[in-house]
């Protein structure tokens, strides 16, 4: 029977080894311990596709549950966010109160005991703020809390996000109830919702940039799962794998998974040939799962900028990109900023940029050839 592949190349799935994130998790755990006055009690995690934002939400939810907290997880990009949050909070209340009309003095729910007296005021369903006030008071009486996590904030309906923020501003920040919030978003949120003067709650949240892993963290994230499953990877193969990931946690999982899968017998050792084949498959998937959706979200000028970069063999100079596009240096600087936010390129010193993903250049060149062929055939 083949040894089980230890890697998890699925968006949002927690990896077998979470490397390079201990300091951030410690900070957020400290915030849950400290309470609503802590600046990180309401936090935004900002990072590009494949950097592990959703995994971090999963991990913080785990920290909260280990403290005996309730958790409520939602995706902001799906319409009806406020309705779903209201239903989730009311459901938590029903579980604790054992029925909205029932007068009770003690109940055990979610592993903790509560001593209180509560009576619903009316038959009407509680709206989000009212429900959070009641739930927050119940949880505070027992020294616990509720953690709300929202993913894909950059794609949320602005009106709903503002409404949610207004509620949390009152319930958590002003009234100091134990309702913590962690949101995750792509960097574009800084030019949209976070630039909206009416979204003051989000603007006041603590912010953490979810950066790429350094080489040592990527090395640990690849080598440790292999070793834990009784397999080995030789030093050259590991170096090759680490370089191919560009520090992206999702790419770490893809390279690890397909290197293991390609190997005839991982328990006898994964070699450089296995890793090279695994990288080929991982880069194909990164093109489909990360580069292609990002490309479709870009403007025509953004796309032309990237195609102009793809003609270089290494780092690109903004002046040369401007010449290729026939525009001014100041003009391309605007799109440089946009593409950094989109997670497609990285700044590399004064006037220079590079692709964020190692495979982006070949992916773009293939796309340019395909587009040219279609134009020629047409």
Predicted features by range, described:
Residues 58-80:
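Conserved catalytic segments around the Walker B and adjacent sensor/switch elements
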Residues 38-59:
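Walker A/P-loop nucleotide-binding motif
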Residues 173, 189-243, 255, 264-267:
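Helix-loop-helix "sensor" segment of P-loop NTPases
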Residues 358-378:
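Short, amphipathic alpha-helical interaction segments positioned at domain boundaries
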Residues 159, 325-342:
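Short amphipathic alpha-helical interaction segments
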Residues 121-187, 195-196:
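Conserved Walker B catalytic segment
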């Amino acid at each position: 029977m083949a040894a089980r592949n230890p890697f998890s190349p699925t968006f949002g799935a927690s990896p077998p080894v979470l490397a390079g994130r201990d300091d951030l998790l410690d900070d957020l755990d400290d915030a849950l311990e400290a309470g609503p006055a802590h600046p990180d009690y309401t936090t935004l995690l900002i990072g590009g596709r494949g950097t592990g934002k959703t995994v971090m939400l999963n991990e913080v939810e785990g920290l909260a549950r280990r403290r005996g907290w309730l958790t409520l997880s939602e995706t902001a990009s799906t319409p009806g966010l406020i309705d779903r949050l209201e239903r989730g909070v009311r459901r938590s209340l029903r579980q604790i109160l054992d029925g909205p009309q029932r007068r009770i003095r003690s109940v055990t729910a979610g592993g903790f005991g509560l001593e209180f007296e509560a009576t619903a005021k009316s038959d009407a369903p509680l709206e989000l703020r009212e429900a959070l006030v009641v739930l927050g008071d119940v949880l505070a009486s027992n020294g616990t809390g509720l953690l709300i996590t929202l993913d894909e904030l950059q794609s949320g309906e602005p009106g709903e996000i503002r409404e949610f923020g207004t509620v949390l501003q009152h319930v958590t920040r002003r009234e100091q109830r134990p309702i913590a919030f962690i949101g995750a978003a792509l960097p574009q949120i800084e030019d949209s919702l976070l630039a909206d003067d009416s979204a003051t709650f989000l603007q006041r949240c603590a912010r953490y940039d979810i950066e790429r892993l350094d080489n040592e963290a990527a090395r640990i994230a690849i080598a440790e799962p292999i070793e834990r499953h009784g397999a080995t990877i030789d030093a050259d193969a590991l170096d090759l794998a680490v370089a191919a990931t560009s520090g992206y946690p999702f790419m770490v999982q893809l390279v690890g998974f397909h290197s293991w899968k390609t190997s005839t017998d991982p328990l006898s050792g994964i070699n450089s040939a296995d890793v090279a084949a695994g990288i080929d498959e991982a880069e194909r998937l990164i093109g489909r799962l990360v580069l292609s959706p990002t490309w479709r979200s870009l403007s025509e000028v953004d796309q032309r900028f990237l195609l102009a970069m793809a003609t270089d063999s290494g780092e690109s100079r903004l002046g040369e990109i401007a010449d290729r596009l026939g525009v001014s240096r100041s003009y391309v600087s605007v799109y440089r900023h946009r593409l950094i936010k989109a997670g497609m390129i990285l700044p590399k010193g004064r006037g220079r940029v590079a692709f964020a993903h190692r495979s982006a250049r070949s992916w773009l060149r293939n796309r340019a050839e395909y587009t040219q062929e279609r134009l020629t055939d047409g």
